[in-house]
Amino acid sequence: MIDRYKHQQLRIGSVSPQQISTWANKILPNGEIVGEVTKPYTFHYKTNKPEKDGLFCERIFGPIKSGICACGNYRVIGNEKEDPKFCEQCGVEFVDSRIRRYQMGYIKLACPVTHVWYLKRLPSYIANLLDKPLKELEGLVYCDFSFARPIAKKPTFLRLRGSFEYEIQSWKYSIPLFFTTQGFDTFRNREISTGAGAIREQLADLDLRIIIDSSLVEWKELGEDGPTGNEWEDRKVGRRKDFLVRRMELAKHFIRTNIEPEWMVLCLLPVLPPELRPIIQIDGGKLMSSDINELYRRVIYRNNTLTDLLTTSRSTPGELVMCQEKLVQEAVDTLLDNGIRGQPMRDGHNKVYKSFSDVIEGKEGRFRETLLGKRVDYSGRSVIVVGPSLSLHRCGLPREIAIELFQTFVIRGLIRQHLASNIGVAKSKIREKEPIVWEILQEVMQGHPVLLNRAPTLHRLGIQAFQPVLVEGRAICLHPLVRKGFNADFDGDQMAVHVPLSLEAQAEARLLMFSHMNLLSPAIGDPISVPTQDMLIGLYVLTSGNRRGICVNRYNPCNRRNYQNERIYDNNYKYTKKKEPFFCNSYDAIGAYRQKRINLDSPLWLRWRLDQRVISAKEAPLEVHYESLGTYYEIYGQYLIVRSIKKEILYIYIRTTVGHISLYREIEEAIQGFCQACSYGP
């Protein structure tokens, strides 16, 4: 449907019988109204043409071939001069055959039938509104018992029954005998209500606002009593309060959506368009039919039988009528949801019939597979792998995927730069993978974001925008910090990539959907781009060092390990080692590591800036080394101070490792980049 803002939307809910009739009925040019399916037949076994008023009737659902009626006559579609617009012999309109994808029909039920979703699904909406046990309502729906209508003011049979003792044997046996008499239909229609009709009458008598007020009053009364000390009673009260809350919310929803409660009981059963439940001819002349067709046939057979019992056979026993109503109810239940809270119906090969619920629900259902998960142009799919060298807002796109997604843009670039005379020549260059193709592809990708999506998309961070870069291989590279937003793991998960085409979509991707703009959880506001798993392990290894400290003693087990340029004797715990190297800056330290002169966790002394003090006023030096020129070294736990003869601080060295230096430089560059970006701001 399309709302007033011209937004296409799909809304699921209950509708009135009048609305179903409006959807299905259509008036032919001769004034005849068609739409009701009355016969359980599909195709004639000799002519292979749809049966009239059957499940594939061309009068109801439209012609199988565009502009050709059931008689074989042909008319040009849309030609205003050709009259009439339908065949006078078979009554089929000369319209496009695509009408069979959306034209509905309906079955007029001989008795009301409850919708199984509202009755047997938990929580049961019908049971909540009527405030009655589900088991009692099921017994009423399936004609296991009845209730009396309080409509007659004069003494009636049921009113007189209260003046007798039901325990008397003669009275107990007289009631069943009366139910089998010929006058039972009149008595039943006047005073007894059973089946789904009884549910419909009770739902029609409900006042939703009174339900809300009474439930609220009862909820407040239960809350005023407080705990009784009896655990069983307190649980019972708690369950009752929860039920009242659900009942009020349900009533408010019915009021807000303008849905009447009695619409949960069906009088007209919609029939799906035939193209959504096709019959296909396979090899050998055999026909393959959708299971829904067989379930519809079952409903029509039983409904027609009930209609005959109510109209033609006046002497039909009441018990037989009630039994047939139960069969109609069960047939509709099987059509809507086969096997809900019971044994499913099976065919001759012991295969469970696929009902309407099975068609639309689940991963392979109509919504998730066809509507939500349908394949679209300018999209691809591949496995994701970690790309630690990528920026947070970038993703690595394989060349094979990128050239397919941006092929039209590359073709336009080749033609504009006069590198190809037409589309065919441009495609030929792309197939041959000429170097100029990759240059143009990179130019195109620089100004065009892509969208990455991981199913299931449970919140808005399931789709984020990235700036693509070309990578080798066939996997999509992703920054590890965005993993949590997608709820993805790098263990074989797949993600889909989409190219936004319109300017509005590209602007939305850049302003709202880029990954570096979605650092907080939209639900609770906590940071969502945080290091996890292997990133934490990597940071630990990077900054762990050898953890020996400057004070080497024989009780530290780390001192027993062998290091380069170091020997430890276990006999007398004496050790000799080369002096730890001194570096003037971090570049020299990292250069020494790359030349394999030191290890990642080897301790070293790094000159520190004097303006960044690391001195603790209360800390005393562990050792003091004096030199011949008067300068001396004060050695502390994790730093070293070089002082002049006048006790002025000349240099400060900190004891660190290459791993610490690398992490510090990354953090420093990130902070400087952030400050630089902020300086250009308003």
Curated annotation (Swiss-Prot):
Keyword Transcription included in the entry's annotation: yes
GO molecular function: DNA binding; DNA-directed RNA polymerase activity; magnesium ion binding; zinc ion binding
Cofactor dependence: Mg(2+); Zn(2+)
Subcellular location: Plastid, Chloroplast
Principal subcellular localisation of the protein: plastid
Superkingdom per UniProt: Eukaryota
Residues reported to bind Mg(2+): D489, D491, D493
Gene Ontology cellular-component annotations: chloroplast; DNA-directed RNA polymerase complex; mitochondrion
Enzyme class: transferase
Residue numbers binding Zn(2+): C69, C71, C87, C90
Keyword Magnesium: yes
SMART domains: RPOLA_N
Stored InterPro entries: DNA-dir_RpoC_beta_prime, RNA_pol_asu, RNA_pol_N, RNA_pol_Rpb1_1, RNA_pol_Rpb1_3_sf, RNA_pol_Rpb1_clamp_domain, RNApol_RpoC1
GO BP terms in the entry: DNA-templated transcription
Note on cofactor: Binds 1 Mg(2+) ion per subunit.
PANTHER family: DNA-DIRECTED RNA POLYMERASE (PTHR19376), DNA-DIRECTED RNA POLYMERASE SUBUNIT BETA (PTHR19376:SF54)
Assembly description: In plastids the minimal PEP RNA polymerase catalytic core is composed of four subunits: alpha, beta, beta', and beta''. When a (nuclear-encoded) sigma factor is associated with the core the holoenzyme is formed, which can initiate transcription.
Family according to the record: Belongs to the RNA polymerase beta' chain family. RpoC1 subfamily.
The protein's name in its UniProt record: DNA-directed RNA polymerase subunit beta'
Annotated organism of origin: Panax ginseng (Korean ginseng)
